[in-house]
Swiss-Prot record:
Its EC number is 2.4.2.21. This is Nicotinate-nucleotide--dimethylbenzimidazole phosphoribosyltransferase. The keyword Transferase applies. The lineage of its organism: Bacteria, Pseudomonadati, Pseudomonadota, Gammaproteobacteria, Enterobacterales. Transmembrane segments: none annotated. Homodimer. It is an enzyme of class 2 (transferase).
Length: 359
């Protein structure tokens, strides 16, 4: 059985030679150089991912939704009843939630994973990786033990890698859990060094008169637990949650296979910050789908050095933004593989020479 450290060491670097070849190929297509903007850069990034073997393409698509409850809900940081987590997870098995509709539209399968729902019995139809019935209340204790965090990371990494073996080449991450923007804000504040007041938002429509309490809860959680910002596992274990750990595991698992993973919203940014502390190499495999409307979103993305492709003012979570952006990935692959070449039409654009086109 591989350890977490073993798996982290398997994450390959992006192939710069493959990216250079892709750049030359794209520059020779039937268009002015650079005229397809970020689609070109995206195709080149995909070409460099070893799991795609130098040719941008999309096989099977999967959105993995990590579902868990949070002890910090007890602090009054969310207005939705805690039971909504289990109810919505069950709705996902019926295909009726936002992510399910958008994933179906994109031709992706949704994998709903119970990593910590607070229900008496497992919910039929969910993938059962439950660690406990909800995480600890981070305002008064750690979210979980380091051992629990490492085991869940390893389990999710292995599950993700198994999906890759079965033909999935594009992953999306999502989550479900009442009060989970509170631990996400704690992670973002810890790793970026920004004050909780700068990153704590309203989540699922928290009334503004309750925002000060939420900020105070995040500040207390960080002060009490003292997470080490350089240690992603420590941050997740002390002020995170099982859903956040699970998302980090998907990112690490996809990257270990040399495959892309679409981020979703604020929760996924927090998980990505922690995952990048464990393995900086994974950042090259992360594709930011959209800009979350949550307050700390720009701070988290700026720290990651990522620019989102969409700005739809969304803050649903669930993996909805990741599913929505999947056609953009397919479009980048399509231009790379299906457009004609300048040389074949005897077109020489200013700045190009015949030898350039034939190289």
């Amino acid at each position: 059985m591989q350890t977490l450290a073993d798996l982290l060491n398997t994450i390959p670097a992006i192939d710069p030679a493959a990216m250079s070849r892709a750049q030359r190929h794209i520059d020779g297509l039937l268009k002015p150089v650079g005229s397809l903007g970020r689609l070109e850069a995206l195709a080149i990034q995909l070409a460099g991912m070893p799991g795609l073997n130098g040719i941008p393409h999309v096989g099977k698509k999967a959105v993995l939704v990590m579902c868990a409850d949070h002890g910090v809900w007890e602090e009054g940081v969310a207005i939705s009843p805690k039971e909504v987590t289990a109810i919505q997870a069950e709705n996902m098995t019926r295909g009726t939630t936002g992510v399910c509709v958008l994933a179906t539209q994109a031709g992706a399968n949704v994998h709903v994973v119970d990593v910590g729902i607070d229900s008496a019995e497992p919910i039929p139809g969910l993938i059962n990786m439950r660690v406990a019935r909800g995480s600890g209340n981070i305002a008064s204790a750690p979210a979980m033990s380091r051992r629990q965090a490492e085991k869940l990371l390893l389990d999710v990494i292995c599950y993700t890698r198994e999906l890759a073996k079965n033909g999935v080449t594009l992953f999306g991450v999502g989550e479900l859990g009442m009060a989970n923007t509170t631990p996400a804000a704690a992670i973002v504040s810890t790793i970026t060094g920004r004050d909780p007041e700068e990153v704590v938002g309203i989540g699922a429509n928290l009334p503004t008169d309750k925002l000060a309490n939420k900020i105070d809860v995040v500040r207390r959680a960080i002060t009490l637990n003292q997470p080490n910002p350089q240690d992603g596992v420590d941050v997740l274990a002390k002020v995170g949650g099982f859903d956040l750990v699970g998302m980090a595991g998907v990112m690490l698992g996809a990257a270990s296979c040399g495959l892309p993973v679409l981020l979703d919203g604020f929760l996924s940014y927090a998980a990505a910050l922690a995952a990048c502390q464990m393995s900086p190499a994974i950042k090259q495999y992360l594709i930011p789908s959209h800009l979350s409307a949550e307050k700390g979103a720009r701070i988290a993305l700026s720290h990651l050095g990522l620019e989102p492709y969409l700005n739809m003012e969304m803050r649903l979570g669930e993996g909805s933004g990741a599913a929505l952006a999947m056609p953009i990935i397919e479009a980048a692959c399509a231009i790379y593989n299906n457009m004609g070449e300048l040389a074949a039409s005897n077109i020489v654009l200013p700045g190009n020479t015949t030898s350039d086109l034939n190289s």
